[in-house]
Structure formats: structure tokens, C-alpha cells
């Protein structure tokens, strides 16, 4: 199995990806945006869940784009475009993305503008991962204003570690998963 090429901040943890993608509700043939794609690890898992997924991996950081491209190649991810720039601009009316069915947002810079653009594109479901409380509050407020707020899930993961010949658990940083759904 291939190893993920990492960047600062590392890839999203597998447990967080699993819950995030479950909340996203990907379907075969969806157009999927991975905003703040980092290593592309979320897109790689999304491609395993939904067949014929069209992926738009977006990040403003050069190191993230290079890591994502390397990881996509290593994991055989096709039907993916790696896009450099600010998500709010790339998702805007002048951008190169026509429509999005589902979006994962791991990069929360300009979260209000990103959410607005995704709603304009009639995105069915949006999942935002955040570790900072202020980001969670801004995201919830923006989603409520846009009429798409569904729920927040707080996840704390602990991993086993050896201690004195026995086992203890070491906690990882908790993550908030904020879910937005298009209202019928």
C-alpha cells in the first residue's frame, strides 16, 4: 500500500475522514470539491467510496498542491483536477468549476465566502472540519445565515501507546465536523 506524502499539518486522520465522508453522503458520479486539500487524503478516500467521482482538489499552498498531485499519482486517482488558488475565487462565477454536488472544506480561510459560493452552486452537502472554536462558530453562523446548517459533530480520537510494558491512550486534537445540507 502507498504512503501519503505529507505537508505541514499532516493528512486528515482516517477516523475523521470516515465520519466526514459519511456525513457528506457521496454518490456515484458526484462532482466533489476538496477545499484546502492539503495532502489529498480526503479525496483519495472519497474516490474509494463513490465511483466515477469528479474531484476538484483546491489549495493555495504550493507544497499542498505538490503533495496532492504526488498522492493522486501514487494511489491511481483519475478524474481529478488539482487547482491552485483561493477557493472563494475558483468556486466563483468566473472560476472554472461549473457545479459541485458535495464539498469537504478542510481549509477554513474565508469560510463565509467559500460557503456562499458553494450554496450558489447548489451544492447538496458540505462538511467543514475545524479545530479552532472560533472557526466552528463562524461556520455555524454562516451556514445558518445561508439556511443550510444541519449539525456539528465533535470527535476526540485517542490512540494506544505503550507505557511501562502496558497500554495507555494518548489523545489527539479534537475535531469539529460542521455539516450543511441543501434544504429541499
From Swiss-Prot:
Gene3D superfamilies in UniProt: Vaccinia Virus protein VP39
The enzyme's E.C. designation: 2.1.1.196
Single Gene Ontology MF annotation: cobalt-precorrin-6B C5-methyltransferase activity
Entry annotated with the keyword Cell inner membrane: no
This protein's record includes keyword Signal: no
GO BP, sorted A to Z: anaerobic cobalamin biosynthetic process; methylation
Positions annotated to bind S-adenosyl-L-methionine: 12, 36-40, 59, 87
Reaction(s) the record says it catalyses: Co-precorrin-6B + S-adenosyl-L-methionine = Co-precorrin-7 + S-adenosyl-L-homocysteine + CO2
Keywords annotated in UniProt: Cobalamin biosynthesis, Methyltransferase, S-adenosyl-L-methionine, Transferase
Biochemical pathway: Cofactor biosynthesis; adenosylcobalamin biosynthesis; cob(II)yrinate a,c-diamide from sirohydrochlorin (anaerobic route): step 8/10
Family, per entry: Belongs to the methyltransferase superfamily. Archaeal-type CbiT family.
Protein name, UniProt field: Probable cobalt-precorrin-6B C(15)-methyltransferase (decarboxylating)
Biological classification of the source: Archaea, Methanobacteriati, Methanobacteriota, Stenosarchaea group, Methanomicrobia
Encoding gene (name): cbiT
